[in-house]
Amino acid sequence: MESQIKKIHQQLVSKEITCTALVQGKLDLLQQNTYNSVNSTLDVLALELAAKVDAKIANGETIGLLEGIPFGIKDVYMLQGTYTTASSDLLKNYKSPYTATAIQKLLDAGAIPLVKENCDSFGHGSSSENTIFGAVKNAVNPELVAGGSSGGSAVNVAKKYTVFSIGGDTGGSIRQPAGYNHIYGFKPTYGRVSRYGLMAYASSTDCVGPLAKSIEDIRIVLNVMSGKDPKDQTSIASTEISEEAISVSSIKTVGYFKNFIESEAIDAKIKADFLAAIEKIKAKGIEVKELDFFKSDILVSTYYTLAMAETASNLSRLDGTNYGNRIEAENLIETYAVTRSENFSEETKRRIVGGNQVLSQGFSDEIYLK
């Protein structure tokens, strides 16, 4: 599919459409949607920003490529003054006091935030069913799950409610729902995009990434968000990806992990489609190498061990003291216990308990360090 960003940009510049009409139309679609993809819409902010874009165009001023382009935000990113709930009871009334670096860069480029998007609570899940706002429905077939945890973001892009959305990927949470909803999702190299302002799940693998209907739009958005950030010590400086780097590739060799695709867990159709894609790559004269990695059956257990350990640590701060839906009890210890047990989802509690177990004395050497 062609770049929607470039198409809309040209329509705005040529005055074929107004930014206000564009934004209002998208907001109407979001508010009327039946896919449970929306946690909250940002009507006032979005229309204020749209009016400013229209004023610039009316005055003959040049607008940037992302200026006036409507986008969605997975509800785990801070955007000052908006609800950031992580689709959880604990933070259902929490308002962001600041804005995430990646989101701020998009705002600085003129993009217009429309919506905070439904997702698995705190990113804990792969179906977008683990949320207080109701399970997200698949954009292709509403009888199926949307994937997760960035399910709402993927559905909104697929249904053209947003031009692009910003999701989060720890262990497939952008790429998997993108695939489920027939769009593109990209997990960048760790550190390419600052994590500042993203609610931490597993900090050593959390990544900020875009979802869109074209690779070109992924490229445009990624370039804007990328870069070293003094607020995130793991962030790195990176080279901008040019349009030519994608359209005129100099890649001569591609590798894939043969043991992954041969796993019994892979659906037959997915395996067939993957191998068909490999043949298309070969047909372009690119050498394809079969690689071996460590056993595929220990991948999931390795991921869960690390992710549960880190999320147990990261979510220990959420006890209702400084923020969140505090539930008072007879004493402080019971207040902490009731606040967390009543406000965390079953899946989140499973991951916290599992994380505390693998980090506890006697288990850390046997499980975590192994």
Which residue stretches match the model-derived regions?
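Short alpha-helical scaffolding segments that buttress acidic/His motifs in well-ordered protein cores
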Residues: L22-K26, T302-Y303, T348-N356
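Residue-level signal for inorganic ion chemistry
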Residues: K26, A46, T99, I218, ...
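A short helix-breaking turn/cap at a secondary-structure junction
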Residues: K187-A272, E334-V338
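Short helix-loop capping/hinge segments that flank enzyme active sites or metal/cofactor-binding pockets
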Residues: L66-A86, V248-F257, A309-K370
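Conserved hydrophobic/aromatic pocket- or pore-lining residues that grip, position, or stack substrates
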Residues: A46, K74, L106, G134, ...
